[in-house]
Amino acid sequence: FINGKTVSVKRDNPDDKAHFGKEVSLKIYDRMEIAAGQSRYQIVQQPIFPGKSKMLNDRRGDLMLLINGMPVFHLELKRSGVPVSQAYNQIEKYAHEGVFTGLFSLVQIFVAMNPEETVYFANPGPDGKFNTDYYFHWADFNNEPINDWKEIASKLLSIPMAHQLIGFYTVADDADGVLKVMRSYQYYAASAISDVVSKTKWDSGKQRGGDIWHSSGKTMTSFKSAQLIANSNDADKVVFLTDRIELGTQSLKEYRAFADENETVQATDNTYELITKLKSIATADTLIVTSIQKMSNIRDEEGGKNARDIELIGKKRLVFIVDEAHRSTFGDMLAIIKETFPRVIFFGFTGTPVFEENAKKNNAQTDVFGNELHRYSIADGIRDKNVLGFDPYKVLTFRDKDVRQAVALEKAKATTVADALNDPAKAAVYYKYMDNTQVKMYGEPGPDGKWIKGIEDYLPNTQYLTAEHKQTVIEDIKENWLTLSHNGKFHAIFATSSI
């Protein structure tokens, strides 16, 4: 309703004889008119919700944010020291009492906050179920949670972000009938992709897309990326490429559930149908789901009779979004597609990227797609409880003290500790790497997002090829197998960098 831009209303006041029975079109909301056009923003303090029965008193909220007079954000605030759970429990209580009905049913996003913590979540509707698994903390580009209320106000609840969140980053999922709002990392990825496409010089011959490394939520993010591109008219076609029929069927079902009422996501039963939809100028054929096999067949089918079609399609601005990119990039099919359509821009989504040390024939993620646009690794997902966690334990093949000393000697260009300490220049370097306050054991991102190396970052992978390390791994498995497998009840996966 809100993203429908306009709504028709028939006047029904019989006393207004001049207009009775006539229809008028009311402009309610335009997702593109951000801080511009006819958009108006207002803040309501302490809105009063009439009680739904004589047994219930009127309820008083804390804040509402209005766009064009419609309440789209509802905020419940608590003072310092009061857990934020009390704020969202109060929202749930109001919802169960029927407060958010009528005009107030237009609330899209709830925000529960105290000065030190904020969570936001989509309105599940009058029949929906509140689920804390979908209560999110906003974070910065590097996935560091933002909780200070001043930063939340300026980065999440301000214009343009609040307008964009309602217009572009919520999804009315037809699959379960529940409104969904995107997490911060999904927003950063989708907006980064849209930004790259908007700045692309299509005839430069140097256009590159990018790589998204996300451990969860990839399907919604990839769809929203495509939707942003289509709505901006920055590309003629956005094609979702999968490398398996099962993935394609699943993706098509999910994309269609995410689509707005006026959007169509096209399937392709064969290569001929794919060619037809790629050539089409119909708006309904903008978003297409197909397989990498069908796309690569366009060049080879019918002995080159597709030349004219390829020429027509090649003139279009094409964006290809590759699902599970770590699988699809191997082999010759992606190379064939790039050769057939040299103007195309590729974006890859994966939770397990292919790094340079594991790549074959320039098939690392950055070689195929371009620079990494955003990262939400499994470590971020475990911290935020968006993916299943691990129960790790560490078995030391080498003592941390010995590893640190070996790195310190190497950096000091010394063979022994005595050799390092007898030379002032070498000693300064040696002490730097021996000092945990200057060089930590493990690397971590700095304030600017750049990686600060730790001792382990200076170690070569060859240490894991030594007989000493291999023997320690084998002994640990043997000694603990009965306990960890619950006497053989469970199997195990052995992960290694090389066989």
What is each residue range found by the language model?
Residues 271-288, 312:
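Conserved motor-coupling elements within RecA-like helicase/translocase cores
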Residues 110-112, 288-291, 320, 345-350:
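Structural recognition of the conserved hydrophobic beta-strand(s) that form the central parallel beta-sheet
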Residues 212, 240, 494:
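Hydrophobic anchor at the beta1->P-loop junction of P-loop NTPases
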Residues 214-216, 324-328, 340-358, 385:
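Conserved helicase ATPase motor motifs in RecA-like P-loop NTPase domains
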